[in-house]
Structures are given as structure tokens and as C-alpha cells.
């Protein structure tokens, strides 16, 4: 049903190439996107949204909200963008959130090392520092700017560092993702949800990554927008209530076992063990539904499973939604089963219980594992801090403690403890339930990449006619209706203005345009993706057709005569998927 719903505007063919420079030129000229700080020469990887860009971006977010808040019943929060160091120490970003960097020994220009060898390796981001250095020599890779030799590869942390407060106060970072704000608020959200699972939470907002050498326009930005979803589920129940409704939907997958695209049903992917579980599969499919609804071409959309050596060590499974662009296949969304990693880490580093109490039907005797601190060893070693450290140890996850060491955070200082200071013991207790650390299913959407992908796949330029059309989905188009008087006289302009004002007040984004020929006005609207144009002519004011106007469909160029008083109703039906030919 989804593909039929949007087939009326997906009229471009895959054979038409798009020059990103032409598209970005249109975006700049018509107010979608502008380079930030352009009067000062601009800054790589930074862009501002113009009036039409803001409208398109907001419409994308509202469609996303309608699915996750409307259909799924998830809740939304808005958390801080500046976080203290402790948050990202626990999450692993302080130690691990880095890209590999190399500098030209001649001109000192910095480059992301793995990007320089993309033409030689399928997944260059998994190469080690040593392997990258060897690849430069093996393939004769030189500085793209001056041709000089490249220096040794190193790690470069991508977080923007700051101080919270004046002077050398508490260290903080601009968040590299919105997700951590949800994780650290888990207990608040859990109580809000009356201590029940599943618990779905969404957040949209800005994130920051100090990219080494951002290129490819909006594909890689230093300040970017995310739409993230964190679904907390019972680790022993990874089904989903609406799974049966979508299990027979087909989807294009690229499993890591074959690395070949194959179409199959969602249920087939789960039953064959290709997708780890039903809840993950459901939200892979939800991502497909969202992207198709936003206007992504199904023929240029696939879901690629992370290879074993690129998957995060804590992830049970991870899939990227990739779209085919002029740059090649590009990731715009990641859907992962993150296991209990996030809550376990924050529980361990903060000393806060972040579990879920799962009640049994009846109390039972069972063996449970607990972490027990060795107080006699902690006292001499840590003195006044020993009591606090012992409490943090005993709040740790037994599974993590079994690794032989745990890290706790004391007054902002990370303290690593080996198992000489604790032991994992098994005790028998009569319990009415058990505490489990929820697992997290995370669909993380790159809003700016989705924005750009929609525009590129919608872009259609006819060089012969010098005519550009953006075939945007009506639901996300920044302007829904262009309202034109045939002439700006004889009352046509007054009639058209009243129609325009009625549409605007009814929540249908419209523009009034009375200048130039009708053909030029259509062209202006087609160029920014406006799906419908309404014209008031002399027949609207007199004769048998009095009170009617013409409405034009952007993609088919078909025109129909309709009652002026029903234009708003008709446009709403069209935006909901009605066939223009049948109105």
C-alpha cells in the first residue's frame, strides 16, 4: 500500500544523474540552504536552513513524529546539548569517539585517512592505523591538495570540548548524539511510564562532531540535526505488538553473510536469522515506511547489515538504511539492537540503579548473581573514598564485572578496579521478581542527510527546456499550493487573495503570486516542489463556471476545474494520497 500511495510523484528514473553543484545552487538561490557565515568566507561542514529549507525540515520531523508519537505512542523529550564529561566517559565517547587523521607533510592539510583509500577498500573505516599507513605506501596515495607525502595516521577525537562555568570549571562537551540525553533520563522516563516496559522515547535536535575534513555538502556536517528513537525493551521479550501486521511486507536487505542485495519479507528475514529479532525487524520496516512516505524512491533504498568487524562490540545486530545518491550508496539512518550497554554503563559510572523490575506471577526461590565489594582491600587503598567506591561496585552489572575489571566514576574521576577488589557471588533468595537491565532498540535518523536525499531524488532538470522540477512528496513540500490570479485586475486579484488567505488560515502552506505569465509562475512553483497550483480566471467570477477555479497537478501537469470553496478540502485529500485524476 505504501508504494502505491506515493507512486504518483516518483516519476524520475534512475538513469538521470544529478550534479550536486546544480542542486546546491538551486537550494541556495531559492532559500533551502545557505553556507553558514558566507560573508566571512564560510566554514566547511556548516549550513543554515533558509525559509523553504526550514519548512521542508519541519515537515520531515512532523511525519516522523506522526509515526513514533502518533502510531506507536512514544513520548518525546528535549535534553541539553552541553553535557558534563562524566556522561561521555560512561558512554565511551571520551575514549573511543575518534576518526583516523593524517596530515600532509608538505602543506599540513588534514585529511580523514580512511577516506583517502576508499577506492581500494570496501570498508576502509575498519582499517587500523598501521594498515592505513601501509595502504598509503602500497597504493601511492598522496596529498589531494598539493601531492605531498602523507604523515603517520593518528586518532582524532570528534567531540567539541568546553568548560561548564568560568575558568577551569567542570569539563563538558557538545553532544555528538542526542541519545545520551535519553539514557541519563531513563529513571525519570521509567517512573513517568509507571515502571512499565516497553518504553519508547524520541528526541530531535542538534548534535556536533568536529569532522576532520567535511566534504560532500550536507552529507557530512559539523553541526547537524538528528531524529533519534530509543526503545527500552525487556531483554527476554523482543517481540512487538504490531509485528504480525507488517511481517509479510517486502524489503531489500544486504545481509553481512553475502553482501548481496536480496528482497524478502520481514518474517522471512527473522525466521532465517538474518535480522536478530522481531522488534528490530519491525523498526527496520518502520524506517522503510517513513522514508517512502517522505519521498525516498523504493528502487534506490536498501538496508545493509553491518559486517562483523564494523559492528559495535555491544550490538546484537545493526542495519543501515542506505539511499542511492550521486555520491553512491549513502547511510541516512541506523537501526540497532544496542543490548544493555548504555544503561549498564551509566548505572556503573553513576552508581545509580537503571534496571527494570520484572514481576513473576508467584514468588520463587532462585539463584541470583551479585557483585560484592572487598571492603578490607578498598579501605587501605582508597581511604575516605572507599565507602563510595564500594557502593558503586555493588551497583555494577555482574555480567560486566565478570570481565575482570570495572570502572566507576568518583567525583568526576574514572577509577578502574580489577577483580581483586570485588567478587561476583551467587546467592539463593525468594523473590517476587527480578531486576533486568532493559535492552535498547535504536532507530537513529540523520535529518540533514534525509533532507538532502529527498531533494536529490526529487530533482529533475530538463536541460533542453531549461526547466527544473522538484518532485517532492506533497506531505513534506514546503509550499502546498500556489494561488494565482490570471491577471492582477478586475477583481481576480481580490478573489485569489481571499482564497490564499483562507488556505493559510486553514493550515495549508500557500503563496500568492500575481507577477509574470502563468507559465513562469508555474515554473517558479515547480522549481521548489509545490505540488498544486490554483488559478483564478474570469470564469471564476461570471458565467456557468462562476465560483470555480482551476487546480493543476505538478507532476502530471493535468488541470481540473473545482469549486473554489472546496479547494482546501481537495488539497487535504490529495496530500493524504487521493488520486488527482479522480478528484
Regions found by a protein language model. Give the residues of each.
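Short, Lys/Arg-enriched N-terminal segments with co-localized hydrophobic residues
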Residues: 1-13
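NTP/phosphate- and nucleic-acid-binding module
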Residues: 10-583
